């Protein structure tokens, strides 16, 4: 930036000097022709003549001034001026040096050449952003000193760390493996849901192995020009071979490694050329000794089979969502820099966050710290973690949203219906918290929290979920009548319908159709799959599927209606508690379900006293 500024500053100064040289003559006076000047001299109208080369600055006796130019050498001019008593002032004209004359005459050409050289250098040395550097790799190389991440910073994925530890040992001591004839994997594909730590694990590998680390995103290869992607792949591997042993990390490789085929775009699009070049570089005629490729994706199903074969990606490392022990370890890592209260127990938080990824847990700790700072607390306590968890799971509170009394009551009945059905149907997750404070896009939320990590779901649990989903709509129908049911159950109906259809078509939970797969394969044409869809079922089978889905819904809908009709007193009591407290937790729900007096929420008295003051 500074060099560019200096360059243009020099150009500006030179241009100003040249134009000043061209316009150095005095142009403040108007110009007259030479014959007029001679005539005025003869008429005795001129008082003074200032001669500078061929330029004469004339001052008349009436004090007016002008300039004139001598077209040819006039030897009689001085005699005429002396005869008429004209004051003559002369000056020897300053002749420009030969170098300056040459420079002025050649300056336009030199300027064009300089500008051309400048732009060419910008194109070639513009940090990969110029037109001449389109084919250069955009991979950033991080040296061993720049990577501070180690395996100590990675938690919750012990199996994945164990899988890649051999890679680190090979990079440190390759001879130990080579003398036994062993070959280190050429490539490792890390697969897992978003936020589980795939990129972090790759950085830890490079940090532990102390080798150069090239990092690039899958979307950085392909751009608007044909052939750029393949050229960048070649350039990247060429630089990597010079730095071997080293690691190349490609994040989101599904952007460039998607399955080839006859999808939209044909078989000769730019992405496929890039993928073909990558396949050749990974396992072609030219060896890549010491160059290890690590890639990460959360869409392994869309990758090309040629990319996944042994010799290219020899290993697939699954980086799954952490279990309760893994979540505890991850929380401890992120809590290192946070001042914690004595009541904070990572295990309790880990048990209450099933399904959270490493990124979710990092966000949880950060949100808790922000809540503590907002309340001017010096340490982060469990209350802050609870508020942060509610915000992440249920969305931010919208207390500024104004709801009428009827809307509050209707929402309270709706959420109470979900809670009651969820508590009384078999094999359902316990209700953790229910609120009628608008959060996100919802007017109220009932949050069910599983007691442990869910690995598979039984048919009974699925049917219980369907019944619970319809509990809110049924509560409104029972209290206000079928004509006054609101649209608040739209999402509940959508989720319940999808569950029932999957039970029939994918999971084999239909007695009439049996354990067969009836769902049509949804091939995405942009992933190199066929545009045409084959129909895998007859019209009669499709009709039976619709009947079975409807039957599942009706059975569980009627079960939920019966449960609510038998527990109307609990429904009314829970509605009253929700309107009074706005949010109730699992302990208050227990009181309501046991038909006991509802205990007050923690801190309720303090809040109430503040309001009275």
From Swiss-Prot:
It is a multi-pass membrane protein. GO terms for cellular component: plasma membrane. Residues 26-98 are extracellular. ATP binds at residues 192-199. Zn(2+) binds at residues 414, 418, 492. GO terms for molecular function: ATP binding; ATP hydrolysis activity; ATP-dependent peptidase activity; metalloendopeptidase activity; zinc ion binding. Its EC number is 3.4.24.-. The chain crosses the membrane at residues 5-25, 99-119. HAMAP family: FtsH. Homohexamer. In the central section; belongs to the AAA ATPase family. In the C-terminal section; belongs to the peptidase M41 family. This is ATP-dependent zinc metalloprotease FtsH. It comes from Buchnera aphidicola subsp. Schizaphis graminum (strain Sg). The gene is ftsH.
């Amino acid at each position: 930036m500074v060099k560019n500024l200096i360059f243009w500053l020099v150009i500006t100064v030179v241009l100003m000097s040249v134009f000043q040289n061209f316009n150095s003559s005095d142009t403040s006076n108007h110009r007259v022709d030479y014959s007029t000047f001679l005539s005025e001299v003869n008429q005795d109208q001129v008082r003074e003549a200032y001669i500078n080369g061929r330029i004469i600055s004339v001052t008349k006796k009436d004090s007016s001034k002008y300039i004139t130019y001598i077209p040819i050498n006039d030897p009689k001019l001085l005699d005429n001026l002396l005869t008429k008593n004209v004051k003559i002032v002369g000056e020897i004209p300053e002749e420009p040096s030969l170098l300056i004359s040459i420079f002025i005459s050649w300056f336009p050409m030199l300027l064009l050449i300089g500008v051309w050289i400048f732009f060419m250098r910008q194109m070639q040395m513009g940090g990969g952003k110029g037109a001449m550097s389109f084919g250069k790799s955009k991979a950033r190389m991080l040296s061993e000193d720049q990577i501070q991440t180690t395996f100590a910073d990675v938690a919750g994925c012990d199996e994945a760390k164990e899988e890649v530890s051999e890679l680190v040992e090979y990079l440190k001591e390759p001879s130990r493996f080579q003398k036994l004839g062993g070959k280190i994997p050429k490539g490792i594909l890390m697969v897992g849901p978003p936020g589980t730590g795939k990129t972090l694990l790759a950085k830890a590998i490079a940090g532990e192995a102390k080798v150069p680390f090239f990092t690039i995103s899958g979307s950085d290869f392909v751009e608007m020009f044909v052939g750029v992607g393949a050229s960048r792949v070649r350039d990247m591997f060429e630089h990597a071979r010079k730095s071997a042993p080293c690691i190349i990390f490609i994040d989101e490789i599904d952007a460039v490694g998607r399955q080839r085929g006859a999808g939209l775009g044909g078989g000769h699009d730019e992405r496929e050329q890039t993928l073909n070049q990558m396949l050749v570089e990974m396992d072609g005629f030219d060896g890549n000794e010491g160059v290890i490729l690590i890639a990460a994706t959360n869409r392994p199903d869309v990758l090309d089979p040629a990319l996944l074969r042994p010799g290219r990606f020899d290993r697939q490392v699954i980086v799954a969502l952490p279990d309760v022990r893994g979540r505890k370890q991850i929380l401890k890592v992120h809590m290192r820099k946070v001042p914690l209260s004595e009541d904070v127990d990572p295990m309790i938080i880990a048990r209450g966050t099933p399904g959270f990824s490493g990124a979710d847990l990092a966000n949880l700790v950060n949100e808790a710290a922000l809540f503590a700072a907002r309340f001017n607390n010096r340490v982060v306590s469990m209350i802050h973690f609870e508020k942060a968890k509610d915000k992440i799971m249920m969305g931010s509170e919208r207390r500024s949203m104004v709801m009428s009394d009827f809307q509050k009551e209707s929402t309270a009945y709706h959420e109470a219906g979900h809670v009651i059905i969820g508590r009384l149907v078999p094999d359902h997750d316990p209700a953790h918290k229910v609120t009628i404070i608008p959060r996100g896009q919802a007017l109220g939320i009932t949050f069910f929290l599983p007691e442990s990590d869910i690995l598979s779901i039984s048919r009974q649990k699925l049917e219980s979920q369907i019944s619970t989903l319809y509990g809110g709509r049924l509560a409104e129908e029972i209290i206000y009548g079928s004509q006054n049911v609101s649209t608040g159950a739209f999402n509940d109906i959508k989720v319940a319908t999808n569950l029932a259809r999957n039970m029939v078509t994918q999971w084999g939970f239909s007695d009439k159709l049996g354990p067969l797969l009836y769902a049509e394969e949804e091939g995405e044409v942009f992933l190199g799959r066929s545009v045409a869809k084959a129909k895998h079922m007859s019209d009669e089978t499709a009709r039976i599927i619709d009947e079975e889905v409807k039957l599942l819904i009706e059975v569980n809908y009627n079960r939920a209606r019966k449960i609510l009709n038998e527990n109307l007193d609990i429904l009314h009591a829970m509605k009253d508690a929700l309107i009074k407290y706005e949010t109730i937790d699992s302990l208050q729900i227990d009181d309501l379900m046991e038909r006991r007096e509802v205990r007050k929420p923690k801190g309720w008295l303090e809040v109430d006293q503040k309001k009275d003051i």
